[in-house]
Amino acid sequence: MMVYIMNAFDIKSTKMDVLSISLHTSDLFDLEDVLVKLGKKFQESGVVPFVLDVQEFDYPESLDLAALVSLFSRHGMQILGLKHSNERWAAVAMKYHLLFCLSHSENVKELGQVEVQKTEDGQKARKTVLITSPVRTGQQVYAEDGDLIVTGAVNQGAELIADGNMHIYAPMRGRALAGAKGDTSARIFIHSMQAELVSVAGIYRNFEQDLPDHLHKQPVQILLQDNRLVISAIGSE
């Protein structure tokens, strides 16, 4: 007799506190000296997760990333992802099965992030991160404290996260999570709706089957109403 287990798991939005290591040198011997002392602290606590901030390095070729990840791991420090303001590092992260976090820098406009503008009352407007390249399977892009605009296709298995709104002007086949820090007014706008999962402020919906024809592969907006996700065709009203 065959037994089928229904609802074996749920997919929910979550946040995990992870420390960041800002790397200042590519010299493995210098790092080893520091980690021999520092690593004892983490080895006593078990494996501790980190994101490796490589903002000080312009080109991926300047780092032996495999050796770096291995070095930190030997001292109880598990590297989960890379952080940089240039999108070229996303492919590097994927190569080594790491997450990618798009960070902010002073040169944000040419590196893919729109500058922070000020509103009429002098207050800072929300930051906007712009991604023009495709987001591939296994990659994650996070627009911290801001909105996210994506003009490249988002593949199945890729994940987009924004603390604010999200605009995707291309086929969306991955996961889209807006209002990640609890902003219930956040919205998601998708040019071609084919997403695996969407979420606003932690309220999510996954899609095991295609949506109705008037929504599937059509422009849609997604928002919260009465603590429920509402998906509607853009221009339908």
From Swiss-Prot:
NCBIfam families tied to this protein: minC
Record field: transmembrane: none
Pfam family, one: MinC_C
Gene: minC
Gene Ontology biological process terms in this record: cell morphogenesis; division septum assembly; regulation of cell division; regulation of cell septum assembly
Coiled coil: none
Alphabetical UniProt keywords: Cell cycle, Cell division, Septation
Role: Cell division inhibitor that blocks the formation of polar Z ring septums. Rapidly oscillates between the poles of the cell to destabilize FtsZ filaments that have formed before they mature into polar Z rings. Prevents FtsZ polymerization.
InterPro entries (alphabetical): CAP/MinC_C (IPR016098), MinC (IPR013033), MinC_C_sf (IPR036145), MinC_N (IPR007874), Septum_form_inhib_MinC_C (IPR005526)
Quaternary structure and partners: Interacts with MinD and FtsZ.
Stated family: Belongs to the MinC family.
Entry keyword annotation includes Cell cycle: yes
PANTHER family named in the record: SEPTUM SITE-DETERMINING PROTEIN MINC (PTHR34108:SF1)
Official protein name in the record: Probable septum site-determining protein MinC
UniProt cross-references to HAMAP family, sorted A to Z: MinC
